Amino acid sequence: MAAKVCRSVLLLSRSSGAVASSAYPAFGVSSQRHQGTKTEALSMSLGGHQTVRRAHGLRTGGRCALFCHPSATLTAQGWKGSPSWQVQRLLCSPAAEDVSVVYQNGLPVISVRLPSRRERCQFTLKPLSDTVGVFLQQLQAEDRGIDRVTIYSADGARIASSTGIDILLMDNFKLVINDTSYLVQPPRRDLLPHEDGERLNDVKILVQQLYTTLRIEEHQLNKERELIGRLEDLNSQLQPLEKVKEELSKKAERRTTWVLWGGMAYMATQFGILARLTWWEYSWDIMEPVTYFITYGTAMAMYAYFVLTRQEYLYPDARDRQYLLFFHRGAKRTRFDIEKYNKLKDAIAEAELDLKRLRDPLQLNLPIQQIDTSKD
């Protein structure tokens, strides 16, 4: 009867010790020790080797409970006064992200921890106008310790520098700074509906027109200064060539005039000879066939001129042709660069035309002068 009572008390002590250790892990060790002492006292009354084994098993169970609850030991130390809970909180808290993307006032702000001084730097980008190349240039300009910086997509494909920031932030990407790679996960943003997209395009066009209207005067002044400077440069290059051209032109003009007067003298001499032979030396009956052949020979000469020059024999055209012949002969003799002279003249004419168009009343937003249709 006494042995049964001792066994029941032992079972109750085991169950109460387990409940206490599970509910109050901080007191698990003391409860196990108390239970072990109580068991040893009961084993002395029983006097059996089996009870000693049970007590040893309870001590082993107490040790298992101690090693299975590391938080209980830390909590017990915390109750003793050491700030282990703060250390545990620091070890368990996640590390700050090196690269993050947030939106502030509608603009993406990329925060990057620079490798030189390990400081976070924020880069505010314009999604519509900035590109990946602009962002990479800003990174290298901010930290001189960055030798290589590239951006890759999530599948490892390199993203071109001309890609827009709005396209880049649509999906995850990898930012590689020197030998360190960062996985960037930008926040998701809903795409605009079709109607809102059209309104946004209209706003873009309106802003561009407003910018053009406000900057048109400054642009025209800068363009006018540029054209005037170009004209001055071209004129300075043309001036020495113009002097040589004037000398050659005068010589060619003088020789052409001599040729014209020589033709006039030839025709006058021919008229005098034919008149002398017709009325003083011979009669008209004899000179008529001669004058016919002279006229026919002159017609053949004019036809030969057309065959050679592909131009009709007209006095102004013949005179200009003779002038050009004399001019080119003089240019070849003096090594005058006619091609360069013509290019400079064309460039000056084009610049003057652009300047005239720039100063047009329509370009300056001035009222147009009305055409007076009334007759005097």
UniProtKB/Swiss-Prot annotation:
Subunit structure comment from the entry: Homotetramer. Component of the uniplex complex.
Coiled-coil residues: 213-254, 336-363
Protein name: Calcium uniporter protein, mitochondrial
Designated gene of the protein: mcu
Mitochondrial intermembrane compartment residues: 281-289
Motif (Selectivity filter): 284-292
Catalytic reaction list: Ca(2+)(in) = Ca(2+)(out)
Activity regulation (UniProt): MCU channel activity is regulated by the heterodimer composed of micu1 and micu2, which act as calcium-sensors. At low calcium levels, micu1 occludes the pore of the MCU channel, preventing mitochondrial calcium uptake. At higher calcium levels, calcium-binding to micu1 and micu2 induces a conformational change that weakens mcu-micu1 interactions and moves the micu1-micu2 heterodimer away from the pore, allowing calcium permeation through the channel. MCU channel activity is gated by emre/smdt1 via the juxtamembrane helix loop. Inhibited by ruthenium red or its derivative Ru360.
Subcellular location: Mitochondrion inner membrane
Domain of life: Eukaryota
Molecular-function GO terms, alphabetical: calcium channel activity; identical protein binding; metal ion binding; uniporter activity
Principal location listed in the UniProt entry: mitochondrion
Topological relation to the membrane, as annotated: Multi-pass membrane protein
Membrane topology (Mitochondrial matrix): 35-257, 310-376
InterPro entries listed in its UniProt record: MCU_C, MCU_fam
Organism: Danio rerio
Lineage of producing organism: Eukaryota, Metazoa, Chordata, Craniata, Vertebrata
Family: Belongs to the MCU (TC 1.A.77) family.
Region (N-terminal MCU domain): 99-189
Annotated organelle transit peptide span: 1-34
Keyword entries, A-Z: Calcium, Calcium channel, Calcium transport, Coiled coil, Ion channel, Ion transport, Membrane, Metal-binding, Mitochondrion, Mitochondrion inner membrane, Transit peptide, Transmembrane, Transmembrane helix, Transport
